[in-house]
Amino acid sequence: MIKGKFLVLLTYLWVAVSTGLSLYISLLLIFRPSPLFPSSYWDIRWLWIFAILFGSIVALFFLAADRLLLFFALLSVAFLIIVPLFTIHILLPYLTVALILLIGFGVGDTVIQTVLRGVHLSKIERFAMSVLMGLGIIMILRSLQGAFGLFFLPITLGGLGILFFLFVLTKIKRWINTILLQVEQLGQFFREGNIANVALGLAVFVLLFAPSWMIALAPPIRYDELTYHLSGSQFYVEQGGIIPFPEGGNNPWLHYAEMLYSLGIELGGLATPRLFHLAMTLLSVLFVYLLGNRLFNRRTGIIAGFLFFSIPLVAYEGATAYIDLFVTAFTTAFGFCLLGYSGDLSRRWLILAGFFGGIGLGMKLSAGPILVGFLACFAVLSLFQKTFSKFLFSMGVMGSIILILCLPWWIRDYLWTGDPFFPYGGDLVRKLSTPIIEPARSTQSSFINSDLIRFISYPIDIVLNSRKYYHEAPGGMVATLPFLALPLWLFSSFIPNRTKKFILVGLCGSMIAIGVMMIVNNALLRYALPVFPWIALGAAANVHVVYKYLENKESWLLGNLLFLLLLAFGFSTRLPIIARLSENLPQRLPINYFLGRENREDYLSRNLPVYDAFRFIDQQPGGRHRVLSVGNEFRLYTSSRIDGVWDVKEAHQLLISAQNESELAIELLKRGYEYILINQPEVEFVKWKYDYPILNQSHFLVRYCQLIFAKNGILVYKIFPEPLVLPQPNNLVQNESFEETSGDQLVAWYQDGSIFVSNEAYEGTRSLLLYGPLSDKFGWVKQKLEIESNQLYTFGYWAKALGNNAILLMQLRWLDENENLIESDEIWKNVETEWNWFYWYSQSPQKSKFVEIYLSLGNSEGVLFDQVCLAAGQMCPVKEQP
C-alpha cells in the first residue's frame, strides 16, 4: 500500500483536473451551444447567477458570517416552499405527499423494528429505511386495491385512515417527543456557535435543490409522462382499477411506482407524482450518505451525497414524473442492506434486501442488471471471506422474496402481451439468437470490435459525449463524476480493506450492470441511474484519502483548496441543467410559472404543442372522442381516446392495410374514429417512423377530411364517409411567381439584402433565388396581406435547393388592425435539390387583421422559390404534389 505523498499528490491533482474538465465542458455548453438544441440569452445570465451565489456562499463561510449564511439559506427554503402555495395553489399536493410519507414512515418503522430487532441503527438510518419500506408496502396495497377494481376515493381514504390510525396515531406522541429532543439539542448546538458547517451544507443544498424544485412543480410535459407514467396512472384512477389501455401502447410498464402515482393523482392531482419522484431522489441521496457514513465517516458520506445529487442527470430526472429514481432508491437501499449483512452476518438484513430488491425489480426491469451484478460480486466476496455457504442459503430466501414481489406483474404482463418481461424478453431472445442464424463469420471479432470497445469506453463517452447515451441534452449530464471515481483510493492505506472490498463490489457490480444493459437497452444514462450512487462513493473515496492525509499534516490551505474544488465541481453541474432545458422557456427554468406570472393553461399551451389541439377536440360535442394520432403518442390532458399509430396496433394496421381512400374513411368511422390528429413537424422530422402512403401520397386528407384546427403544426381533421366538396381556394398573394419586377424591385414584395430572379422556374419563366444568412448574398422577402380573423389558412410554395444542407423558414406573423404583432407561427424545413411543395397550416388569431408572409433561409445554400400561396381553407389553388 502507498501511504506517502505521491499517491495523495496524484489523487489531489486528479480531483483538480477532473473538476477543471467538468468546468470546461459546462462552459462549452454555454459559450458554444449545440446547433441541435435551442440556446437562450438567459444562459449567460444563469452562468453569472450561479457564479455569484456560489461565490457568496464561499465568502460568507470564510468570513465566518455563519448566522447570516444560515439566515439566507433558511429564507430561501421558506421562499421555495411558501411562494407556490399562493402562486400555483400547491397546498393539496403538498398535503397528499406529506400524508403518504408520514403513513409510509409509520408502517415502515413497525416493520424495520420487527425485522431488525436487536440490530443497532442510527436515527437517520432507521428513518430512511422506514420511509422506503413503508412506501413499498403502500405500493403493494395499492396494487391489490387496483387488481380488485377498488380505485374509488371512499375506499382509498378509508384504507389510508386505517393505516394512519394503526401506524401513526399510536406512535405520534413518541415522535413528537423525539423531535422536541432533537430541536433542544439543535438549539444547544447553535448556542455554542457550531453552525458554520450546518449553514454551509444547507446553503449548498438549497442551491442544488432549487432548479429541481421549480421543475418538479411545473406541469408535466415530458414524453414518457404524457404517454404512460401519468396518463396510464390517471386512466387507472378513472376506470377504478388496473385494466388494459384500450389504446394498448406502453400500458404494461405501469407497475409499483405508478401505483403510488395513481394514489397521488387520486388524492392530490397531477402535481403529486413529480413530488413523489423528487422525494425518491432525496431518499437516494440519503442512502448514498448513509453508505458513505458507514464505510468512511460523516464528512465523506456528505461528500458522496453531494457528488451524487449534484450531477445534472440526477437533478433533472429526479424532478420529473419518470420512475428511475424510484429504482435508484430501492437498489441503493438493497446495497445498504448487503453492507449491513457484511458487518454482522445477520440474515435479517437479507430479508430487507429481498424486499427492496423485489420492489425495485417489480417496478422496472432496469433494476435487474444492478441487482444481478451486485449479488454476483458480493457472492465472490463472501467466497473469499469463507461465508459463501451461509450467504448462499440466505440468498435463496432473499431471491424468493424478490420473485414473490415481481411475479404478479410478470404474470400480468404475460397475459397482456405474451412477454413477461415486455418488451425486453422478446428483444433479448432475438439478440441472443442472431449469431446462430447469421453466417458463421467471426461473431467474436464483431463483439471485440464493437460491443467490447463500447463497454470499455463507456465511462469516457458519458463524460465527454453524454449525448451518445442521453439524446435529450447537448452534454455534460454526469459532469466528470466517473473520472473522479478512478480507483486511486484502492492503493491507499487510509481506507480499511473492508471498505475497499465493498466499494469494489459496488463498482464491479455496476460494470456488470452496464454490460447487461448494453445488450438489452444500450445502457442509456437514465436506465443506468442506479449505478451512480456507487460511482459517487468511489469519487468520495478519493476525496477521503486527500482529507485524511491533510488532517495528519494540518494543512489548512490545501484543505480549503480541496473544499473550493468541490464547490467548483458543484457549480459546473448547474450549467448543463440549464442547457438541457429545451422547452419553450427563455428563462430555461419555469420561473414565471413558479412566481404566478403565467397560469397553467398558458404554460402548457406554450410548451406542449398538442395541448391546444386536445382542448379543441374535447370541446367538440359528442362525449369522449376517438382520435387517430400521427406523430403524437401523448394522452395526458385530454379526455379523448388518443390512438397513436406508433404504439397502437389497430391504428397502424388500418393505415397500412387500406386499399383506397374510400375504404379507409369507411373503416375509420366504423371503428369509432372521428378525428385525425397530425403533428406535422414530428412527421416531417422522422419520416421513416410515420411513412403512411395513404396519408401523405394520396388526396385522402383533402377528399375525406376537413381541416378544423391548425396551430403550432398540430392539425386536426374531421373524418367524413363521402368525398367533400371544398370551396374553390383563392390565392391572396400578389406576384406569386415573381414574374413582375420594377427595376431591381419585385412588385408587391418588400425585400431586404441580396435578391435574385432566376430563369429556372417550376411554372412560368421566373423564380426567386435567395441565400441564407451564412452567405455574403443573404436576403429575404415578405408581403403583407389582409385576412380574416379566426380563419384557417394554407401557406405554401414550391422550392428547390441549389446545394445540400439547405434549410428554409416558413414564417407567418399575425398582426392586428394597428399592425402590431399578435403572434408568430413558424417552422424550419429541409430543402432537397429538386422541386418540392412545402406547406404549412395556421389559424389566424382573434382580432387579427393582417398577416406578413416571409420567405427566408438558414445556412448559406441558395434556394429557388415559386408559386407562393396563402389561401383560406386547407388547399392552395396552385398545382400541389399529392
PLM feature spans:
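Short periplasmic/luminal acceptor-recognition loop of GT-C membrane glycosyltransferases, typified by
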Residues: 603-645, 675-681
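Signature aromatic-anchored transmembrane alpha helix within multi-pass, membrane-resident enzymes
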Residues: 198-206, 299, 351-355, 371-378, ...
